[in-house]
């Protein structure tokens, strides 16, 4: 009887152990699955939230620095009249002209390409990392990323050369580095491509407008009305900017033709002035030649008259003897 009771009790304990083991195993698996799912959901939620957060952060930075919405460039440059026309386009809040070109810096064989621009006004505001903004001709502000590589140091001289120094648009080559900066136009490590040197731009620099020897702007930056209220990279923003871009392109043909006629007219006027100067020069030379011939003829006549007088004098002297 006792034996049966012990066996029954053992079976009961075994059943309880089995049930407890199953319950514990299920609980552990459930908890593991729960945490795996929770981790996946959290990771997915983080990824989902990262894009809008990054977009909002970038948009806030763009608004603070007044990053351009559109950039306009012309092969014949942009005149003050072109800037006025751009500012009159419906949807354009502000248009600013500037000067920009790619230059070479460093020793031959290891030259770097630097994108050099003039300091702007309200658009594409720079953030000074160290030093200050250039205040006069011969000073420059350097890309902080480029300065961090050790190629350019505060207070040192940076030499910028164009591909054709004989036809340079810069008034001087040497510039004193007075500060380093970051620009809203460059948000990645890459600085763009170029036709100079290695084909890659190493960094950028800014100088005052009076360092450029040009009559017209090489680039114009535009802000679109209402773009600040939209979030960058969204469909609403893209559609708004595209409408303004379409209107800007609508005046392109007229402005290009006016600029072409202006350049052509100036060239023709210079040619006409040159031809007139050449004709006047020929006329003057011809007149001077004729005057010289007359003077020579008069001198020859005077010489002959003098010789005749001399011979008469000699003859009279001979007759007197």
Residue spans of the language-model regions?
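Membrane transport/envelope proteins' first extracytoplasmic loop
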Residues: 3-321
């Amino acid at each position: 009887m006792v034996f049966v009771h012990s066996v029954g009790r053992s079976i009961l304990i075994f059943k309880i152990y089995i049930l407890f083991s199953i319950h514990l195993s299920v609980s552990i698996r459930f908890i593991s699955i729960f945490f795996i799912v929770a981790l996946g959901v959290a990771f997915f939620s983080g990824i989902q939230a990262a894009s809008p957060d990054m977009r909002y952060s970038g948009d806030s930075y763009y608004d603070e620095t007044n990053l351009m919405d559109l950039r306009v460039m012309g092969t014949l440059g942009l005149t003050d009249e072109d800037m006025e026309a751009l500012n009159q386009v419906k949807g354009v809040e502000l248009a600013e002209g500037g000067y920009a070109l790619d230059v070479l810096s460093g020793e031959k064989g290891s030259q770097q390409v630097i994108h050099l621009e003039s300091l702007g006004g309200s658009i594409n505001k720079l953030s000074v990392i160290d030093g200050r903004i250039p205040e006069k001709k011969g000073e420059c502000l350097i890309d902080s990323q480029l300065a961090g590589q050790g190629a350019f140091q505060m207070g040192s001289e940076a030499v910028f050369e164009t591909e054709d120094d004989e036809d340079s648009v810069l008034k001087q080559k040497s510039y004193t580095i007075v500060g380093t900066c970051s620009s809203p136009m460059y948000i990645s490590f890459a600085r763009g491509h170029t036709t100079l040197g290695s084909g890659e731009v190493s960094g950028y620099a800014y100088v005052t407008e009076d360092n450029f020897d040009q009559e017209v702007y090489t680039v114009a930056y535009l802000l679109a009305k209402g773009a600040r209220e939209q979030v960058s990279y969204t469909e609403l923003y893209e559609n708004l900017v595209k409408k303004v871009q379409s209107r800007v392109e609508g005046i392109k043909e007229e402005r290009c033709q006016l600029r072409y006629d202006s350049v052509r007219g100036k060239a023709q006027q210079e040619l006409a002035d040159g031809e007139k100067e050449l004709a006047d020069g020929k006329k003057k030379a011809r007149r001077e030649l004729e005057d010289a011939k007359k003077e020579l003829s008069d001198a020859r006549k005077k010489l002959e008259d003098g010789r005749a007088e001399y011979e008469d004098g000699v003859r009279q002297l001979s007759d007197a003897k």
